[in-house]
């Protein structure tokens, strides 16, 4: 009779295809609220603000992007940019500069003095229309009667085309006088765009409580 030899039995390792891979890292969601070169500031659903860096060029995010990011100590890494509704950008012969995403409207702020460029205004309007973003034109410095009257007259063709135009005196206006602009912005995600000297900082500081302190904090 044949004898069966007893051999020690060792568990076989599973093939490579059956081995369990480590679970993917847990990602948090957030909104990009500021951009500074190669990093940005992401606001979480509970109001925290975290400095995040992109994972390669494909994860490059702009203000207004909804992102998924991975925490790492006191900073984070952006792993994915969610699908955008739109992207406001400027393109020339050299490069494309992205400003913001997922916008409801663009407020184009110009001033009676210094004289605004109709070419720049038209380019901004075309960029907004191309992405189906509503443009709003605000002409600042209505407290300067002569230059304001001339500037308002130059804007007549834009009024005739149906664009919304609003006069303003951002430094001198009372809160009540600024209410029409506030009503236009209420509940909407808006990009404020304009040349140097048009009053962008004044507008934001007048309309957004604590904006000056927040800007100073992010800059530091």
Kindly label every feature range from the protein language model.
Residues 1-118:
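N-terminal accessory targeting/assembly segments
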Residues 144-198:
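Canonical P-loop GTPase G-domain recognition
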Residues 119-130, 134:
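Histidine-anchored nucleotide/phosphate-binding helix
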Residues 64, 128, 140:
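Residue-level signal for inorganic ion chemistry
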Residues 39, 109-112, 127, 131, ...:
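Conserved, well-folded catalytic cores of nucleic-acid-processing
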Residues 103-109, 132-142, 162-168:
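Conserved beta-strand/loop subsegment of P-loop NTPase cores
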Residues 113-114, 143, 219-220:
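Flexible beta-alpha connector loops of hexameric P-loop NTPases
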Residues 33-49, 55-72, 178-220:
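Conserved G1/Walker A P-loop phosphate-binding module
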């Amino acid at each position: 009779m044949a004898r069966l030899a007893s051999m020690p039995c060792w568990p076989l390792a599973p093939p490579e295809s059956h081995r369990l891979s480590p679970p993917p890292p847990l990602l948090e969601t957030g909104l990009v609220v500021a951009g500074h070169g190669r990093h940005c500031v992401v606001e979480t659903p509970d109001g925290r603000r975290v400095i995040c860096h992109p994972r390669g060029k494909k994860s490059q995010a702009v203000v207004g992007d909804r992102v998924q990011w991975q925490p790492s100590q006191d900073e984070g890494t952006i792993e994915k940019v969610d699908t955008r509704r739109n992207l406001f950008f400027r393109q020339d012969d050299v490069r494309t500069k992205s400003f913001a995403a997922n916008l409801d409207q663009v407020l184009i702020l110009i001033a009676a003095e210094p004289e605004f460029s109709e070419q720049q205004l038209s380019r901004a309007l075309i960029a907004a229309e191309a992405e189906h973003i509503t443009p709003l034109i605000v002409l600042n410095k209505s407290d300067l009667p002569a230059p304001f009257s001339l500037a308002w007259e130059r804007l007549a063709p834009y009024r005739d085309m149906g664009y919304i135009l609003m006069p303003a005196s951002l430094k001198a206006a009372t809160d009540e006088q600024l209410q029409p602009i506030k009503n236009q912005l209420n509940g909407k995600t808006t990009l404020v765009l304009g040349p140097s000297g048009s009053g962008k900082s004044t507008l934001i500081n007048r309309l957004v409580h604590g904006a000056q302190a927040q800007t100073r904090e992010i800059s530091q």
